[in-house]
Amino acid sequence: MTERADEEGVRRKLRLIRLLHQTNPYPQGLGTARQRRNRRRRWERRWKQILALADRIYTFPDPPADPPLDQTIQQLQGLTIQTLPDPPTTQRLAETQGSLPAVWVRVDPRSVPGPREGYKRDSYERGEELVGGSGTNRKGDTRSSTKDQAGSRNCPPVRDRDISKETL
């Protein structure tokens, strides 16, 4: 009967603490910056008061003590490390063995591309020149001076007589 009364007392205390927390909602974001800041400060002061009051209403019991160090050491001593088999010495031996331990299975990294097949990440591999490159492309063709870098529209050539002091 005392356990049930203790449980009911704990529940009553926790309900009271929950009610206290519900009576202090976080402030809404209306008003000027100063008004919002002051509301947050007042809310934080009330929140600290509620925490102090809740701590007086119900103090949580201490957690159970850690197991003694001797017991922990004994548990660690009971652990064993399995010895790993030697890795295969040749590639053929590795292929003929049907069941290799997962430790020695060869894994190829995904980021290593093959000899320029299917991997077109760099401008060199795409055959494009970087900005300010030479006047020829990889095929040896010279670029047209009337095309912009995108090569999609024609631009008229600029002559010295078109530029005057007024335009500068």
UniProtKB/Swiss-Prot annotation:
Keywords: AIDS, Host cytoplasm, Host nucleus, mRNA transport, RNA-binding, Transport. It is found in: Host nucleus, Host nucleolus; Host cytoplasm. GO terms for biological process: mRNA transport. The keyword RNA-binding applies. Residues 108-168 are annotated as: Disordered. A motif (Nuclear localization signal and RNA-binding (RRE)) lies at residues 35-49. Its main location: host cell. InterPro entries: REV_protein (IPR000625). A motif (Nuclear export signal and binding to XPO1) lies at residues 71-82. Residues 16-24 are annotated as: Homomultimerization. The keyword RNA-binding applies. The RNA-binding motif binds to the RRE, a stem-and-loop structure present in incompletely spliced viral pre-mRNAs. This region also contains the NLS which mediates nuclear localization. These overlapping functions prevent Rev bound to RRE from undesirable return to the nucleus. When Rev binds the RRE, the NLS becomes masked while the NES remains accessible. This is Protein Rev. The gene is rev.
